């Protein structure tokens, strides 16, 4: 049976230094985000960045945080709901960093009897720090916990004509700019 795993970047649980610290640590310790040897990345992230960044980032997150929670999580859940309403295929939502995790998303699909997973990174472009890290972690989890599953990943679509038209249309509608 087939299912879809939507994957976005992620967000801390709340806009507080306490919740930002583990989120930033998970994110910045990813070798595909900071491409340094592990020893140097550890010194940089744990020895320098995590001592000050959570407090500074919390102030920025508080400015954009919605009463419903993280805008990224809220909008990702809304996207999942819209897709579910218009599809008969089981959909699960996960985040590369934070929760719901990729493991949780795969577990949800597994519990529904899904064994063919179409992974949809919610980024149009390919980058080591986005799409690649999703694929690497998903494959690691598959090998460790869901070896019966088969994965296919949506290829980058930044140059897809329909995607460009949709983004253009959304922009024009939002700004009420007429097409010329």
Language model region names:
Residues 164-172:
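A Trp-anchored, charged/polar loop motif used as the substrate-binding/catalytic surface
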Residues 92-165:
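Long, hydrophobic, well-ordered secondary-structure blocks that form the structural core
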Residues 2-93:
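N-terminal glycine-rich anion-binding loop in soluble enzyme alpha/beta folds
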Residues 16, 71-72, 96-101, 108, ...:
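Secondary-structure junction/capping motif
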Residues 11-13, 124, 179:
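Active-site micro-motifs of SAM-dependent methyltransferase domains
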Residues 171, 176-180:
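Single conserved hydrophobic/aromatic residue that forms the stacking wall/gate
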């Amino acid at each position: 049976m087939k299912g879809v795993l939507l994957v976005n970047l992620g967000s801390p649980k709340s806009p507080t230094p306490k919740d930002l610290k583990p989120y930033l640590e998970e994110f910045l310790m990813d070798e595909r985000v900071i491409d340094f040897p592990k020893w140097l990345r550890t010194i940089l992230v744990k020895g320098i960045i995590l001592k000050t960044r959570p407090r500074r980032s919390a102030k920025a997150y508080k400015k954009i945080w919605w009463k419903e929670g993280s805008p990224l999580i809220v909008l990702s859940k809304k996207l999942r709901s819209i897709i579910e309403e218009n599809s008969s295929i089981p959909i699960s939502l996960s985040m590369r960093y934070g929760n719901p995790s990729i493991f949780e998303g795969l577990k949800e699909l597994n519990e529904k009897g899904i064994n063919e997973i179409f992974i949809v990174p919610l980024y149009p472009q390919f980058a080591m720090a986005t799409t690649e890290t999703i694929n690497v972690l998903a494959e690691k989890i598959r090998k460790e916990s869901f070896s019966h599953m088969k994965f296919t990943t949506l290829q980058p679509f930044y140059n897809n004509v329909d995607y460009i038209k949709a983004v253009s249309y959304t922009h024009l509608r939002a700004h009420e700019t007429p097409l010329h």
